Amino acid sequence: MLLRLLLPLLLLWSTSLSAQGFDSLMRTHGMVEVTQLAPHIRVELKYATRDNFIGENMYGALKKAYLHPNLARALARAQQALEAELPGYRFLIYDAARPQSVQRRMYQAVAGTPKKIYVAAPERGGRHNYGVAVDLTIIDDKGKPLDMGSPFDHFGEEAHLGNEEARVRAGIFSEAVPRNRALMRRLLGAEGLRPYDKEWWHYQERMPMSEVRKRYRLLAF
């Protein structure tokens, strides 16, 4: 009976934390809001919607993308280079810094399934949990995402980097996919970021995870 009475209060507390607290906690943990440095970058956080592999809104009302200042500045420079090369084109962020509590929920959702290889264990945290990884794509001057070969959060070989030309020959990819992925790698690579080979959308700083844990603060909330 007591638990039944407490459940609505716990739900209200959780909703309040995600709706109001995440923004404040991101800032107190040293993160910066990306569009303050790069106002032309678009943000559509997939984990603030049901359009993700879990099918739940895990961010509540959080709509802004936060990153460690180093990564945010690198992304801002990459956006400038993109616009100089292709006026009107922008990066579109799907996910950025991620609270450890959200990581736990994601990990629990894939536990015991083949998808678990794609989600970092929450105890020590992955790169998103330190604000040094970003999930993104490129949109054209009409706001349409470029063809990258698979949707965001696709758990399959189509999301993996490499063999793009072979997949074009096999009719799996359009001829635009290798060009679009190469554009991402070139622009972001020029700013010191590298991709994760199993997720075309995931870019991170070029340092081992052990060094990330030494230098940066875990988003332990």
Predicted regions and their residues:
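Sec-dependent signal peptide recognition
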Residues: 1-8
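Segments that shape or occlude catalytic/ligand-binding pockets
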Residues: 99
